[in-house]
Amino acid sequence: MSNKGIQSIRGFSDILPEESPLWQYAESAIRRVLESYGYREIRLPVLERTELFSRSIGEVTDIVEKEMYTFDDRNGDSVTLRPEGTAGCVRAGIQSGLLHNAEPRLWYAGPMFRHERPQKGRLRQFHQVGAEVFGIPEPELDAEMIIMTARMLRELGLSDVRLQLNSLGTPESRAAHREQLVAYLRRHEDRLDEDARRRLETNPLRIFDSKNPQVQQVMADAPRLMDCLDSVSAEHFTVVRNLLERAGVEYEVNPSLVRGLDYYTRTVFEWVTDRLGAQGTVCAGGRFDGLVEQLGGRPTPAIGFALGLERLVALLEDQGTPGQGGAPHAYLVVATEAGAGLEMAEALRDALPALRVQMHAGGGGFKAQLKRADRSGARVALILGDDEQAAGALTIKDLRGEDGQQRLPLDDAVTYLRGLIGA
């Protein structure tokens, strides 16, 4: 029996306290933008019936065939840890009646699960912020959603990401394209690898995603879905592009962009970067006008996207973005009875709700407490001894700058701390 402590499961990572501030910064910025566009939060379960994903994502996709965490519960029902958020959001919208006679704008956040090979930017438990809008078929909404994602990336200071667009048309135009694509690939089948040959029989559009250079050469000359678009889808895509250009959002049309989920129709988009190696997609989305009906609801047009938080945080970390929260602003050194320390800490929080103040606990002399204050990362130590308590004052010791040490009446100490935190 090993005497090693229990380790986390491969591909499931802890987000440690020193990492959390950057996550909080990213999540807060994204939430602010979503709310400014009228989106409301919905909180969804991480466990759903397996049928939900096989019906929505597609039974012959890599996700359903190879990547889902699926098991039978004690009742013998097949259940799955969610690999993405859209299907659950649609299910909740149908079940609750949210989609009936309404045009809800919803957002959600949380962990998703896929049994993939862990690598940089790809974990088996990963986190997304997603958003969906239901009931609006017009291309203006496609453009607004893409413009909103551009605003999110600007708010986070990310400039080296590129927008790629494509249109997948309707199921009918995809069927016409599939016929042409299969005929082309049959002529070049000897140049396809085993995975591409398998997809040729099940889901040939996914061969555009191949990372094999030889297969990529074959696909470079393959029939393009865009050339098979029906006139309504083509006009829809033209309007989206024109609106993005009017808004100053730069993009490139990528005919090979097909997305990994079967439910997409018409507009699809991705924000990509070269700074994350092979896992360069930071945000992706598109229309799914048939999914609500497919899952048992009324015919309802819809569009959505998801942002990958691990990849977003990696970009922020790489460019040196400071996080939100983190270390305390002040560390309260208590050189008098503990009750007075508790009262002082609460009084400071009442006066300055934005102040992060950590009170010393666990015993130790004055010097030991100051060492703990320094190690905490706090900018100042607040010293409360018998003299300070009697005088209604605090001694403030600057731990990071050149202000030295000064005793101030409590009101003046609050003013000093207000300036310290910019409140």
Curated annotation (Swiss-Prot):
InterPro entries cross-referenced by the UniProt entry: aa-tRNA-synth_II (IPR006195), aa-tRNA-synth_II/BPL/LPL (IPR045864), Anticodon-bd (IPR004154), Anticodon-bd_dom_sf (IPR036621), His-tRNA-ligase (IPR015807), HisRS-like_core (IPR041715), HisRS/HisZ (IPR004516), HisRS_anticodon (IPR033656)
Keywords: Aminoacyl-tRNA synthetase, ATP-binding, Cytoplasm, Ligase, Nucleotide-binding, Protein biosynthesis
One GO BP annotation of this record: histidyl-tRNA aminoacylation
PROSITE patterns per record: AA_TRNA_LIGASE_II
Gene Ontology CC annotations of this record: cytoplasm
Major site of localization recorded for this protein: cytoplasm
EC number: 6.1.1.21
Catalysed reaction equations from the record: tRNA(His) + L-histidine + ATP = L-histidyl-tRNA(His) + AMP + diphosphate + H(+)
Signal peptide stretch: none
Domain of life: Bacteria
Hydrolase keyword on record: no
Subcellular locations according to the entry: Cytoplasm
GO molecular function: ATP binding; histidine-tRNA ligase activity
CDD domains from the UniProt entry: HisRS-like_core, HisRS_anticodon
Assembly with partners or alone: Homodimer.
Family under the similarity heading: Belongs to the class-II aminoacyl-tRNA synthetase family.
HAMAP family: His_tRNA_synth (MF_00127)
Name of the protein in its database record: Histidine--tRNA ligase
Gene source species: Halorhodospira halophila (strain DSM 244 / SL1) (Ectothiorhodospira halophila (strain DSM 244 / SL1))
Organism taxonomic ancestry: Bacteria, Pseudomonadati, Pseudomonadota, Gammaproteobacteria, Chromatiales
Gene designation per UniProt: hisS
